[in-house]
Amino acid sequence: MNVEINGSPILTTLPIFGGIPLTATLVVTWSIMLLLTLFCIWLTHDLRVDHVTTRQTVAEFLVYTAQNFVDSNMGTRFSHYAPFVAAIFSLSLLSSLSGLLGVFSPTADLSTELAWAVLVFVLITATKIKTNGIGGYLKGYTQPIAVLTPFNIISEIATPISMAFRHFGNIVSGTVISTLIYAALGAASHALFGLLPGAVGDLLSRIPFLSVGIPAVFSLYFDWFSSFMQAFIFCMLTMMYIAAAAEAD
């Protein structure tokens, strides 16, 4: 049983700035963002006050859900973060589920989660500076005593890194387990039907019967449920850190 798991493949190299590799992560991520943008435009065009369409009802439901999600976890003064949280959640969920279509999942590439985490880190830092000012923000690194400054800096940097690795680790571990289960069922099918005598056994042993249907059961968790939970947890951590950063020191 040979199992091989690789990183994001390089599709081509753009002949600019000495050659920029165009990876599957970039292509799939931008494709998902384009589809999300077109979907939002389709949902929100031709909005009405009377004779509301089903499309508008769905759009209002999604907006209300995102707004309520942010308000209930961060407070109403952070309502303006609802579009950002909804975008991160949608992008994370669809990026993880894109692997079901046979393309490379962007969330299986650590650079994707690191980019999101850096963006969240910038928002956290900006919120702290807005709340306490530059002086108060820098002074916060010396609390409660100045000797802890290096540890406070490390703790600050560790926040986005831990968010990225937690999300990446859970997605990749699910991919690895699903791949191992699929490969093991294929090997078991080959061994089981190979016990049949003659040409019938030789023919049936080449068809991975056990790999059809059974992996779908595990996919409900490792692909669908896990993808939803990882997107949900990443958004929860984002809201928690930003809300905490808005508290005056």
Label the model's feature ranges.
Residues 1-249:
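Selective transmembrane helix interface/packing segments
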